[in-house]
């Protein structure tokens, strides 16, 4: 962990769980998580909230943390009451990267045959929208984790970076690909080749971050956005998310073709009928997720 801490300025205040009620779980196992905290938030308890909670290690993303994160994501994905998910860290650090101690003794054979980091991208397969609420440092794997989310809200003191080059390696969980798509080749290349960090303000200007808020309100703002998303039809929201994500994987012609198919598909749903009827009748739609 010394190598990890050497990449960061000194974090004086200890991390602590915040904005949480007592842990609420609807998972198959009754055992408490070790590395994360979960809760349902929002007036209708329709937002799943996950906090990375490994403060002594600056929320370094060890294998156990990723396993627990995937379990929580799956549970919220299967919960019919939850329409969106917020992922956050601590007040000083979102996540400072992968766990260097776990990586230090790995060999090429270990990584290749074992599919090292292959389970990190389960977040990208979640159909419900995921909002990252980032305070403090989102570096290395922490930055990659934030970029796997659908929306990034940042605290005004947040910093983003891919400093793997400084410890003799490169990003391995999508950093070179997602960062380039988000901010463009020149800035991504500079960040990856120098290990330099960018501020929340620079990240927003570059298109990596959607909005910036004061440190103490960023999580609550993300929850409010998630509540707004969760008030819509879950099935149509999933279609919209799939269509936007296709823009990063397909040509324009292919993406427009998929969009058209998904658009047509909404006409097979009861929620499309309800939404249009509510608009014509000048009332609020009552979606049933059907």
From Swiss-Prot:
It comes from the Eukaryota. The modification N6-succinyllysine is found at residues 101, 204. It catalyses: a (3S)-3-hydroxyacyl-CoA = a (2E)-enoyl-CoA + H2O; a (3E)-enoyl-CoA = a 4-saturated (2E)-enoyl-CoA; (3E)-hexenoyl-CoA = (2E)-hexenoyl-CoA; (3S)-3-hydroxybutanoyl-CoA = (2E)-butenoyl-CoA + H2O. Keywords: Acetylation, Fatty acid metabolism, Isomerase, Lipid metabolism, Lyase, Mitochondrion, Transit peptide. Substrate binds at residues 98-101, 141. GO terms for cellular component: mitochondrial matrix; mitochondrion. It is found in: Mitochondrion matrix. One of its GO terms (molecular function) is 3-hydroxypropionyl-CoA dehydratase activity. Residues 1-27 form a transit peptide. Coiled coil: none annotated. The record marks 164 as: Important for catalytic activity. One of its GO terms (biological process) is fatty acid beta-oxidation. Its EC number is 4.2.1.17, 5.3.3.8. PROSITE patterns: ENOYL_COA_HYDRATASE. Converts unsaturated trans-2-enoyl-CoA species ((2E)-enoyl-CoA) to the corresponding 3(S)-3-hydroxyacyl-CoA species through addition of a water molecule to the double bond. Catalyzes the hydration of medium- and short-chained fatty enoyl-CoA thioesters from 4 carbons long (C4) up to C16. Has high substrate specificity for crotonyl-CoA ((2E)-butenoyl-CoA) and moderate specificity for acryloyl-CoA, 3-methylcrotonyl-CoA (3-methyl-(2E)-butenoyl-CoA) and methacrylyl-CoA ((2E)-2-methylpropenoyl-CoA). Can bind tiglyl-CoA (2-methylcrotonoyl-CoA), but hydrates only a small amount of this substrate. PANTHER family: ENOYL-COA HYDRATASE, MITOCHONDRIAL, ENOYL-COA HYDRATASE-RELATED. Homohexamer; dimer of trimers. Belongs to the enoyl-CoA hydratase/isomerase family. This is Enoyl-CoA hydratase, mitochondrial. The lineage of its organism: Eukaryota, Metazoa, Chordata, Craniata, Vertebrata.
